[in-house]
Regions:
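Catalytic-core helical/loop segments in enzymes performing group transfer/polymerization on anionic/lipid-linked
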Residues: 1-699
Length: 699
């Protein structure tokens, strides 16, 4: 099966359409030999689709009308937003009530109880997060951030998410507020909804009649603000109607009105989700089912449905969804979760000083930190004084004299390649309490592990992450090709000792007694005199980028065998124990089901999952592995996809790295490193706010 089209616009979206529809898309030109399973596609009911539709009829082939879904984009398509849904209707199209559509058929089909429950959960998430068609709306300074509950949205008087001027204007009167929704003149959804421009006038008259003492608010269409398109009602002289043309989140406006009047706008559907009375003066897809006050009728829509049944059809079953990071089809809940990850509160600080960052780090630090402050300032040393709306951010344990600074470090699933070879991190941990590897003082991660309640859903997610990590064998750096390892046939216990970089901050601040690879090997040999000790040096040491070599005497006495370019994940199935000072490999080994002994105090020690030579006194809680994994990989770090600029989940990064495979552990040449540095210099100088810089209002 293949798809064919003559539309250049559709072909331009080939990379997103193909995974959503699950078949290749081709340009229909010249003599094409079609098979009986092929499908011709066009975009909605645009005039240029008539030819291809007639072609399909002449050939006896199916014809699908394509459209954006109702949760359409992360960002706005005019500003590089990412498409996340597609409708492919083989019957008609949802906005044309003059003929049947697949959506109409789905709405009329009874749902299983499980599907209705799923739809109810989805409604709750859409309302809680403010998910809409174009998810591109910023918060405003001084807005109130409510609890995030669904009920918070329906409280009239909570003006969070509205521009301050509009919020002030709306609070000037206690009268009922009725929202009239304008649309672009000539929009195909108007005649498709059995309506005309006269129905907009009738809508205003009905609102006046039904609510004689109310304030009538006319919401203009966003596309009319620049003057390139005109609205049906906005051009009329309506003395008793207040124009609302402010750029604001649709839900922020919907939550402060008492009813919604529309002809065929999607705002009416979103009004239903928010529990508002909706009056329809056309026949949009959500009208005619007993959920709206309708001025028109459609004979085909002769059953009453519940809101969950409407949502199940319109948002779960009808559109196809795309994970824009992985480029593969997904479910609506996954898209909602991706959108939710882009939600960031308004900046906490006016100015954030990033101290001592090299030029190549500045580009990726901007991406990870821009949501924290209105202004990022890269400086060589900390400022002497800070105002109440300023903060300092430093790398790791640098500037230990700073008490309240944010400390940043690589995440636990970092990249495909070494940081010392200038591979950008896909994950960072930004900690306002301390830093996770410094066991001398508390950290944000330690506080999460000590005190954060982990729900059953979160434990299940932790278990799923463990299974995913075991399946794909993803680690922090993902260097060294997976190779076969032949376990020594000497009958002895096989103990893997993982080396680190001598002088590493995690050793100096997190290992009170054992502080070098050589000391570690001597300690393990003393504890395990009969074991076969397998030693794996740190990749940076192998690459020649850092120090950490051991003496010949230690090598002869303490090490039975070494591995260099075999990844740790290839060794875990064969070893009986892993010993380390503070290496992340201990955490990775726990995930892979290996017994772990720590000689320092890494973040994963002290929770009852490891054997600890020096257990940390502050860590009194006992955690299941799934909770440790959830809090460490989900709750603590931030993840970015550099291709799309989106905040992502650890699951997405794991799958992405698994697709990419492993990189070489060899040191990059000086020329290669300079090429990378120059690229980052250019990016730093030319950088503009990335797609992830938009923020959604929390209600």
């Amino acid at each position: 099966m293949a798809l064919y089209t003559g539309s250049k616009g559709i072909l331009a979206r080939k990379n997103s359409i193909e995974p959503m529809l699950g078949c290749p898309l081709h340009h229909m030109e010249g003599a094409v030999s079609f098979s009986e399973n092929d499908v011709l596609v066009g975009w909605g009911q645009k005039a240029n689709t008539n030819q291809i539709k007639q072609k399909a009829q002449a050939l006896g082939l199916p014809y699908w009308q394509l459209e954006d879904g109702f949760i359409g984009y992360i960002g706005h398509p005019a500003r590089g937003g990412k498409a996340v849904s597609l409708i492919a209707d083989p019957v008609g199209i949802y906005y044309d009530a003059r003929q049947p559509s697949q959506l109409e058929q789905l709405i009329a089909t009874p749902c299983e109880p499980q599907m209705l429950e799923r739809a109810e959960r989805l409604i709750g998430e859409l309302v809680r997060l403010g998910v809409t068609k174009y998810n591109c709306y910023a918060t405003y300074p001084g807005q109130s951030i409510a609890s995030g509950s669904v009920t918070a949205l329906s409280v009239v008087g909570d003006y969070g998410g509205l521009p301050s001027g509009l919020a002030t204007r709306l609070q000037q009167s206690a009268k009922l507020r009725i929202l009239l929704v304008d649309q672009v003149a000539g929009d195909l959804s108007i005649p498709g909804a059995l309506a005309s421009e006269a129905d907009f006038v009738a809508m205003v008259e009905a609102a006046r009649r039904n609510h004689p003492d109310a304030r009538l608010l006319l919401r203009t269409h966003p596309d009319t603000r620049l003057g390139k398109k005109r609205g049906v009602l906005a051009r009329l002289n309506l003395d008793d109607v207040e124009i609302v043309a402010d750029h604001c989140h649709p839900h922020a406006l919907l939550k402060v009105v008492d009813a919604v009047y529309t002809v065929s706008s999607q705002l009416g559907f979103e009004g239903l989700l928010l529990g508002k009375p909706v009056y329809c003066f056309g026949m949009p897809f959500y009208a005619g089912w007993g959920l709206t006050h309708d001025s028109k009728q459609c004979e085909r829509r002769n059953v009453k449905v519940s809101l969950p049944q409407l949502v199940a059809a319109a948002l779960i079953c009808y559109p196809r969804y795309l994970d824009p990071v992985l480029g593969q089809r997904c479910e609506v809940e996954e898209v909602v979760a991706i959108i939710a990850r882009q939600i960031k509160p308004a900046p906490r600080w006016r100015r954030l000083y990033l101290v001592g960052f090299s030029l190549w780090k500045r580009a990726f630090m901007q991406a990870f930190c821009h949501h924290l402050a209105e202004e990022l300032c890269f400086v060589s040393k900390p400022p002497k004084r800070l105002t109440g709306d300023e903060q300092i951010l430093v790398w790791g344990s640098r500037h230990p004299d700073l008490v309240s600074a944010i400390r940043v470090e690589d995440g636990f699933i970092r990249s495909r390649g070494l940081g010392s070879n200038l591979c950008r991190p896909s994950s960072l941990s930004l900690d306002p309490v301390g830093i996770y590897f410094d066991s001398r003082t508390p950290s944000g991660l330690e506080q999460l592990l000590n005190y954060q309640r982990v729900t059953e859903v979160e434990v299940k997610r932790g278990d799923a992450l463990i299974a995913l990590l075991r399946e794909h064998r993803v680690s922090k750096y993902n260097v060294g090709e997976p190779q076969h390892y032949a376990k020594p046939d000497d009958g002895r216990e096989l103990v893997l000792v993982v080396g680190q970089v001598d002088g590493d901050a995690s050793i100096l601040t997190g290992s009170p007694h054992i502080r070098s690879n050589e000391q570690l090997l001597w300690a393990v040999r003393a504890a395990k005199p009969e074991a076969h000790i397998l030693y794996k040096p740190h990749p940076d040491v192998v690459a020649g980028n850092r120090g950490g070599m051991i003496s010949a005497a230690c090598l002869a006495e303490c090490v039975d065998s070494q591995v260099l370019d075999i990844g740790l994940t290839s060794l875990y199935p064969h070893v009986d124990e892993l010993h380390t000072m503070t290496s992340l490999s201990g955490f990775e080994a726990l995930v892979q089901g290996v017994k772990v002994t720590t000689w320092g105090q890494p973040f994963y020690s002290g929770w009852g999952l490891t054997t600890d030579a020096n257990p940390p006194a502050r860590r009194q809680r006992r955690l299941p592995l799934a909770a440790l994994v959830y809090l460490t990989l989900v709750a603590y770090p931030l993840y970015i996809d550099w291709q799309t600029g989106l905040w992502i989940s650890p699951e997405q990064l794991i799958r992405q790295l698994a697709k990419q495979g492993h990189s070489s552990a060899q040191k990059a040449s000086r020329w290669q490193r300079w090429q990378v540095k120059l690229g980052y210099l250019f990016q730093t100088l030319m950088q503009r706010p990335a797609p992830l810089s938009f923020r959604f209002p929390r209600f």
